[in-house]
Amino acid sequence: MAPVIQFKDVVKIYPLKSGDVTALDHISFEVDHGEFISIMGPSGSGKSTLLTMMGCLDTPTSGDIFISGLRTRDMSDTELTNLRRDRIGFIFQYFNLFPLLNIIENVSFPQMLKSQAQVDEKKAIEVLHAVQLDEHLYTHTPLELSGGQQQRVAIARALINEPDILLCDEPTGNLDSKTGASIMDLMTDLHKNGSTIIVVTHDPHVAEYTERTIRIVDGRIVS
């Protein structure tokens, strides 16, 4: 079976007026199906750029990226959009929930975009159960929830299209330590159920939950 994610000699250079900035410098690595890994590094090291590349939100300057054996540079914009929508779930530090929609509607939003259908309440409730959000909150709006509860909603939204890969950018960065630990416990449960999870973090306590850590400094993998 092909790795779910594979980088081969990937370089990303951002041209600026002050001069080119190399965000990723000849990066090569693989992520197998079902792995739970963390990406660590100091601010500006390239770890968020790496996550962006994994999510097909940007293209490399050179090198190749494969998602489940498919080389992204061979795919059209429409194919890349479908790949992101169908196979990749995104979880961010800032929850990016819609304040005027209730929790069921927020969770259902990616599915509504996919099929242009009405809210699939049954599916939304299924994933909300999976992230252990109390049922009495389902008709509330995000601003009525705590930070930890909002992050659970964001995770449920990422799960609703049953992605192969979950990409998480500092998922506990906006939470207190106790709430952050509960979110990482949830991630561990999702991993045990077969999810491939990649977490960008600066927090070594978060990295302890994962199976292995990729450390990146100045755009290069150092361990």
Where in this protein do the model-derived segments appear?
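Short coil-to-helix segment of the ABC ATPase nucleotide-binding domain corresponding to the Q-loop/switch region
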Residues: 101-108
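ABC-type ATPase nucleotide-binding domains, specifically the catalytic core motifs of the NBD
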Residues: 15-17, 108-120, 130-132
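Conserved ABC ATPase "signature" region
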Residues: 70-71, 119-136
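Conserved ABC ATPase signature
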Residues: 141-145, 149-151
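Catalytic Walker B motif of ABC-type/P-loop ATPase nucleotide-binding domains
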Residues: 166-169
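Conserved catalytic motifs of ABC-family nucleotide-binding domains
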Residues: 162
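Conserved ABC transporter NBD signature motif
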Residues: 63-71
